[in-house]
Design a protein with these regions (language model features):
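Catalytic machinery of carbohydrate-active enzymes
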Residues: 1-233
Length: 233
């Protein structure tokens, strides 16, 4: 087996999309290295803390490309694999996420089949207690500061709203209990949407809503989702 550098898009949502990919590569290789924006490092390293042969290297795309270039001379890794731009075809009818997995040489079903994160229930409970939702509540995530705001008229007014405000935690997985216990989930297309869709939990009465109008995306980059979402365009 070999040592490989795997580069994919570095958004936190992209890390969730490629969780299954990374885990499959760690089965196939002796050593795997991936990259993470420093701001996402806590979440990414937490998500993969159960994999001993994975190295998460903090750095942006420019750092990652330079690291991969320098590896040609240092030969610390036997192989490099880039499954993101410039290898994606935005004019292809194949969705972006499927292209990721095809470029990685993996069945797209591995996105869900191989997804895994070891939850820390004590951390989740600490955040749940800190936010103290009472009764039925809505978990809502948007980004009004960037102009990606959910129209509150499209959200039921008879429930409290809980949102992941900045400064609460630097680990997205601390929100898992708040997510799974919510009466409704209202999201823009973001890392939280991917977390909700990929996270295995049981709440059959929970309503899932994506407010797509708040963050429109090209058709080729629309998410591939498994759960029963209502989409508001």
């Amino acid at each position: 087996m070999t040592k490989i550098i795997l580069l994919h898009h570095l958004g936190l949502g992209d890390h969730l999309i490629t969780n299954g990919m990374v885990r499959e590569y760690c089965k196939m290789h002796d050593r795997v290295a991936i990259f993470s924006y420093p701001k996402n490092y806590t979440s990414v390293s937490f998500m993969f803390r159960d994999i001993p042969n994975l190295e998460v290297i903090p750095g942006d795309e420019a750092f990652a490309l330079l690291f991969m270039f320098n590896n040609k001379f240092r030969r610390k890794y036997d192989e490099t694999k880039n499954v993101g731009l410039p290898h994606l075809d935005i004019f292809d009818s194949e969705p972006m996420e499927k292209q990721f997995y095809r470029l990685a040489g993996l069945d797209f079903a591995k996105k869900w089949e191989s997804f895994r994160v070891e939850r820390d229930r004590s951390r989740e409970q600490a955040l749940f207690d800190k936010m103290k939702p009472k009764g039925d509540y809505i978990f809502l995530h948007d980004d009004a500061a960037r102009g990606l705001a959910i129209d509150r008229k499209k959200v039921p007014a008879d429930h409290a709203v809980v949102s992941p405000a900045s400064g609460l935690t630097d680990n997205i997985f601390d929100f898992c209990s708040l997510i799974e216990k919510a009466k409704e989930i209202h999201l823009i297309e973001s890392s939280f949407m991917y977390l909700v869709d990929l996270l295995p939990y049981t709440n059959p009465e929970q309503k899932l809503v994506i407010h797509r109008y708040a963050r429109p995306n090209p058709v080729w980059s629309l998410p591939a989702l498994k759960k029963n979402w209502e989409i508001i365009d």
